[in-house]
UniProtKB/Swiss-Prot annotation:
The gene is SOAT2. One of its GO terms (cellular component) is endoplasmic reticulum membrane. This is Sterol O-acyltransferase 2. Its EC number is 2.3.1.26. It comes from the Eukaryota. Residues 1-120, 189-200, 257-297, 374-421, 469-474 are cytoplasmic.
Length: 526
């Protein structure tokens, strides 16, 4: 037996040339020259493990701190919580308890996280390169046809015509939304005798009726009377719908607590500053407080506004190069099924481009810019809708801001009113409200009624929502979802462009109701 227990012996191995050579090795399975490397690698992996655990604990601690802070902020200011009502005393003035409530936390938008990955930034660079190609092609065509290098923005200038008038119209809309709902809430919350309170409540309802009249009638009157172009109409209709949804959310969230406060349950009325902040922050769900970021990154704000402007220019180039030359004279040619099908297929590419540009410009750039200026912490305005394998998931993740409003005030309140068994009816109600709102926006912006969006959203979209449900997974379903999106966008762009030019080539000799609601592109082929 040799001392030390580690005998050094010679081991014969074959070299590359078949020769045998002697190598020293110790007892065991690990070679001497590999042992230090293995120890270093083990220590490195242990350090990585400790670092990951520390980061995960920090994030979890931050999440729990934020949740606890929100719970403290929402706790009543009295020394003891308000008494719980008995189970049989639930009234319509109390909030429904069905479903989950929206919780706001500090988080970044998904695209901001993906932009940190170089591979995804390359896709972003490809879209910028596409814009450069459109600019180069426009310059080249103008130089060949007219012998000059000049970018013309006729379509952009036409679309945003009379924008100052739209901005002036926005002022009374905003003031009505700022003053009427809050003053109505104060009148309802005022203590006093029953007769005095009834008079104040009636005055509050009159204020809300005047507010609704201003929001519904004023923008429509200005748009029709002054023949505003599409982009200026967009400003009015988006603000009209936004103010209506925010007013409803404020009243829906604040009225139950206000009525309980009148009964002496110790609940404070909402502050005017919180309501003013809510009117500008990028959410449609009212809360007294929201998680806030510590500072404002003005370079991030400028970057998002610049990207939104770039998307507007991109959309103008797409319409001017891919849509206007195809559809401008289509109504002057004889109708044929072949021409209609080819026009729809031709419009799929510009249609999906327009969808992506609207998503990126509004749901990412515009909302993030305002969120940053207001230090609004929750930036989850959308989720990964592009990975959806069902249309039900696509509808939930495409526009989280609007989905939260529909879920809270249409679906959940529908279940509260009709019972938990009426989930199908509540879901149909969500589709009906959303489809009518989308069709109204299209009708307002384009200046004519052509229910393409209503049929696609309510009928086709509703069927696909139940047929392509969440149980379908896998890449094939994602491909099918994208195929349906391509075709749907092609149908919208093709039919709406045909109707736009048909109403200009074939004006009505006499304005009638049926002439206004009947598609002109079906009969205008001169």
């Amino acid at each position: 037996m040799e001392p030390g227990g580690a005998r050094l012996r010679l081991q014969r191995t074959e070299g590359p040339g078949g020769e045998r050579e002697h190598q020293p090795c110790r007892d065991g399975n690990t070679e001497t020259h590999r042992a230090p490397d293995l120890v270093k690698w083990t220590r490195h992996m242990e350090a990585v493990k400790a670092q990951l655990l520390e980061q995960a604990q920090g994030q979890l601690r931050e999440l729990l701190d934020r949740a606890m802070w929100e719970a403290i902020q929402s706790y009543p200011s009295q020394d003891k919580p308000p008494p719980l009502p008995p189970p049989d005393s639930l009234s319509r003035t109390q909030e429904p308890s069905l479903g989950k409530q929206k919780v706001f936390i500090i988080r970044k938008s998904l695209l901001d996280e993906l932009m940190e990955v170089q591979h995804f930034r390359t896709i972003y660079h490809m879209f910028i390169a596409g814009l450069c190609v459109f600019i180069i092609s426009t310059l080249a065509i103008d130089f060949i046809d007219e012998g000059r290098l000049l970018l013309e923005f006729d379509l952009l200038i036409f679309s945003f015509g009379q924008l100052p008038l739209a901005l002036v119209t926005w002022v009374p809309m905003f003031l009505s939304t700022l003053l009427a709902p809050y003053q109505a809430l104060r009148l309802w919350a005022r203590p006093g005798a029953r007769g005095t309170w009834t008079l104040g409540a009636g005055l509050g309802c009159a204020l809300l009726a005047a507010h609704a009249l201003v929001l519904c009638a004023l923008p429509v009157h200005v748009a029709v009377e002054h023949q505003l172009p599409p982009a200026s109409r967009c400003v009015l209709v988006f603000e009209q719908v936004r103010f209506l949804m925010k007013s409803y959310s404020f009243l829906r969230e604040a009225v139950p607590g206000t009525l309980r406060a009148r009964r002496g349950e110790g609940i404070q009325a909402p502050s005017f500053s919180s309501y003013l902040y809510f009117l500008f922050c990028p959410t449609l769900i009212y809360r007294e407080t929201y998680p806030r970021t510590p500072y404002i990154r003005w370079n991030y704000v400028a970057k998002n506004f610049a990207q939104a402007l770039g998307c507007v220019l991109y959309a103008c180039f797409i319409l001017g190069r891919l849509c206007v030359p195809v559809f401008a004279n289509m109504s002057r040619e004889p109708f044929s099924t072949r021409a209609l099908v080819l026009s729809i297929l031709h419009a799929t590419l510009p249609g999906i481009f327009m969808l992506l540009l609207i998503f990126f410009a509004f749901l990412h750039c515009w909302l993030n810019a305002f969120a940053e200026m207001l230090r609004f912490g929750d930036r989850m305005f959308y989720r990964d809708w592009w990975n959806s394998t069902s249309f039900s998931n696509y509808y939930r993740t495409w526009n989280v801001v609007v989905h939260d409003w529909l879920y809270s005030y249409v679906y959940q309140d529908g279940l509260w009113l009709l019972g938990a068994q009426a989930r199908g009816v509540a879901m149909l109600g969500v589709f009906l409200v959303s489809a009518v709102a989308h069709e109204y926006i299209f009708c307002f912006v384009l200046g004519f009624f052509y229910p393409v969006m209503l049929i696609l959203f309510l009928v086709i979209g509703g069927m696909l929502n139940f047929m392509m449900h969440d149980q379908h997974t896998g890449p094939a379903w994602n491909v099918l979802m994208w195929t349906m999106l391509f075709l749907g966008q092609g149908i919208q762009v093709s039919l709406y462009c045909q109707e736009w030019y048909a109403r200009r080539h074939c004006p009505l000799p006499q304005t009638t109701f049926w002439g206004l609601v009947t598609p002109r592109s079906w009969s205008c082929h001169t």
